[in-house]
Amino acid sequence: MRAAIVFVCLLLGAGCDESSPVGPTVGLNERFTLAPAEVAVIRDAGLRVEFVDVSSDSRCPAGVLCIQAGDAVVRIRVIEGNASTFYDLHTGDSNRAAIVHGSVRIALAELQPYPFSTGTIAPGEYRATFTASRV
């Protein structure tokens, strides 16, 4: 019996990256929000999506008059089986706010918090909201 329990534990943990906290399990067409390094499981698609980080954030701060709205770049990692692919999603360009991985479209819906001119955003404070849908 003990061997069976150990086997099940190993089987369940085999597909997990121990360095990334597991986040929500969501279905297609559901919005989900992740913190940096958090991973969502997309059931019905066989994918996991990790919010890696915000590699740059030049969005115009709230309360400031800017010529351009700016852009933030959200790096994600899509994990399918043992393979993973990195992508950059942009807040300031609707043509680059989504990617297609196989038959699944992953779109960045929102990045919070929005910058203010009076402070900086610590990397761990970011929360990115995504959707995943069939192409």
Stretches with model-predicted labels:
Residues 17-135:
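Surface-exposed, beta-sheet-biased, low-hydrophobicity segments with strongly acidic/polar composition
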Residues 1-4:
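Positively charged n-region of N-terminal signal peptides that target proteins for export
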Residues 12-15:
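C-terminal motif of bacterial Sec signal peptides marking the signal peptidase cleavage site
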Residues 6-10:
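Hydrophobic helical h-region of N-terminal Sec-dependent signal peptides
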